[in-house]
A protein has these predicted regions:
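Substrate-recognition element of Asp-dependent hydrolases with the DxDx(T/V) motif
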Residues: 25, 89-116, 171
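Helix-loop "lid/cap" segments that line or gate small-molecule binding pockets
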Residues: 28, 47-59, 114, 148
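Short helix-capping segments at alpha-helix termini
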Residues: 30-35, 62, 95-96, 119-124, ...
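Metal-dependent phosphoesterase signature
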Residues: 37, 53-91, 96
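Active-site neighborhood of HAD-like aspartate-dependent phosphohydrolases
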Residues: 1-41, 58
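Conserved SAM-binding loop
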Residues: 14, 41, 100, 136, ...
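Short beta->alpha linker loops
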Residues: 20, 43-47, 84-85, 106, ...
């Protein structure tokens, strides 16, 4: 039997946070007069470094620091609840001796906030790849390839769970099987870009995953 693993994005896949981030980034787009329609949707799945570089490069570094601090303060007051069925699905994977990794565009400071609120959350993963471990963020495949290397699993034997278009692209370009969660984007938007679309993890089994 071949060795396989499951790799999960965090926000919008394991944790129900994306609607909260919509509020923050919409306000930033308004505050700095970016004039980009649905700006909060365009940046989904990308790192803070990428967001600042791609959309706020016209601002001085001091203003970047203001945005960073505003985000940190916002994240400390966020609610980090589960996507339905996520934790139970991971439990089933581990019962089947399938390695589990988390691959997120969040940096270590954000993860520290999450792990403080969710004691033991970090302990369920065999590897964690954060923005601090990579030089090129999603949609580049570096993060997923690094996770596969950490776990000693060939990319073609990795299952990726993603909600954002940038993450879906990263998993696809890494040569992995991508399963899309219709949490951030409607199913119709991602259906032709993934092997399967699920609304959440309830009623989704390890056997179904392996059959894809």
């Amino acid at each position: 039997m071949k060795n396989i693993c499951a790799l999960f994005d965090m926000d919008g896949v394991l944790l129900d946070t994306e609607s909260q981030y919509d509020i923050f980034w919409h306000s930033m787009g308004e505050k700095y007069h970016l004039g980009i329609e649905k700006f909060e949707k365009k940046i989904k799945g990308t790192t803070l470094v990428s967001i600042l570089s791609n959309y706020f490069s016209h601002l001085p570094e001091t203003e970047h620091d203001v945005i960073k601090q505003s985000l940190l303060d916002f994240e400390k007051n966020m609610t980090y609840s589960d996507i339905p069925g996520a934790m139970k699905f991971i439990e089933k994977l581990k019962e089947n001796n399938i390695k589990v990794g988390m691959v997120t565009s969040s940096d270590d400071e954000k993860l520290s906030t999450v792990f403080t609120q969710r004691a033991g959350f970090d302990k369920i993963f065999d590897t964690i790849v954060s923005a601090n471990r990579i030089t090129q963020g999603k949609p580049h495949p570096m993060c997923y390839l690094l996770a596969a290397k950490d776990l000693g699993i060939d990319p073609e034997n990795c299952y990726v769970f993603e909600d954002a278009l940038s993450g879906i692209q990263a998993g696809t370009d890494a040569g992995m099987t991508v399963i899309g969660l219709a949490t951030t984007n409607p199913a119709e938007l991602i259906r032709d870009k993934v092997s399967k679309v699920i609304p959440h993890f309830e009623d989704f089994s390890v056997e179904e995953m392996k059959a894809i």
